[in-house]
Amino acid sequence: MRSLHDIAAPAKLNLFLHVTGRRADGYHLLQSAFMLLDWHDTLHFERRGDGALSREDRLTPLPENDLTLRAARALQEATGTTAGAHIAIEKRLPAEAGMGGGSSDAASCLLALNRLWDLHLPLSALEKIGLSLGADVPFFLRGRNAWVEGVGEQITPVTLPRARFAVVKPGRGLATKDIFASPALKRDCESATIAGFAAHPWDFGRNDLESVARKLCPEVGEAIEWLGSQDLRARMTGSGSAVFALLPPGKLLGRAPAHWAEDGWVVRECSNMEVHPLVGWAPSDDSV
């Protein structure tokens, strides 16, 4: 196999996010429900025989050492393969949004190169590599909506109804490290249960990061209030700055403020997905 094209890397929303503690090494303990969206980046891969890794940014310039290249390099180091790749990225997901765009790109890269390079690593091995890159990567590798705990490594699949969502991404982004470094962040939320979430998935819990985010980026509050003015219950996803709201059947969004487009805001209607397009691309441990 010489190439793989049109590889999707979908976004996620955190339906809720509770911070339940902090480990001695500084990592925060979380509980959350991750849901896949039909908004995605698109990746293309060409195999190289010289072992080199290169990247082409087709829509939006990315940092020189982004998660996609780091994922490819980590896979090379873990396996000792001499294969390389040229990776082209059509970046549509906004950065610093709390939607997992970089982590999703990394996961799709690991799955695609595992196939392109004929490595046949099981999913568990890819998850180990993925967790070293970012807490959200294992979720995207599993590829199903999930209840997530710990630092992102405890993943339990959940079934969610099909639904539409309004997503608003302010022009400003938020760095995850700034949110978690805030002394105002509460880190002692009581543990919740999957059963409690399953009974009311669309309005369960809250996002414990939201109050800190609104202070660092007032546009988060502006987006929530705009959705609220349309009788929609909005909250932030992940560490922001994107916010979202469930759209009831037949609900149409009103016109966004005129300055938003000029200031780089994005307003989009999305639907959730049951499974990631690449589910099954890595063998399970039982089949290896």
Residue ranges with predicted function:
Residues 23, 68, 100-104, 136, ...:
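Gly/Ser/Thr-rich beta-alpha loop segments that engage phosphate groups in nucleotides
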Residues 1-97, 115-124, 169-172:
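ATP-binding N-lobe of GHMP and related small-molecule kinases
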Residues 88-117, 135, 233-247:
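Glycine/serine-rich anion-binding loops at beta->alpha junctions
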Residues 84, 106, 110-147:
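Contiguous, small/hydrophobic- and glycine-enriched helical/loop subdomains that border
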